[in-house]
């Protein structure tokens, strides 16, 4: 693949679009990018075949009035053979697992609550650890709590920090344990 050849690739779709380059496969044959419409209400995750220059749209997303850029999450698993993508297509932020061709494999989380930022992905166990908001009836919906979900099962979500407080968690590289510091306005930090 190391030909040092410069190849111009047409990645234009919308006038004044915004481009984020996301990932390159280990073999260098696939390049992934995300493009946004200037109005920020439409986006596409695309893959470029670096040998041919062909661009393929894998995921197309629209959200009115606009996409929430700050909560955006795209993770490439197993060298780009799977894509974990966060979407608000149902009105709630949730995670979706796609194959390398953009076919939906599983909606990992769902329901009337928000799946927030990912804290860790364990590809060996096929699990994600993420912040959730508003899922538990007895926990203030503004508090960050930690959940674990299985990538291959729909709604296999487990609450890991059940205290009614906002949690700040550090997860061990092995995913076997985590350190939790939680607090709220009327509760000093507990570790």
Segments from the language model and where they lie:
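Peripheral, non-catalytic segments that deliver or gate enzyme domains
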Residues: 1-191
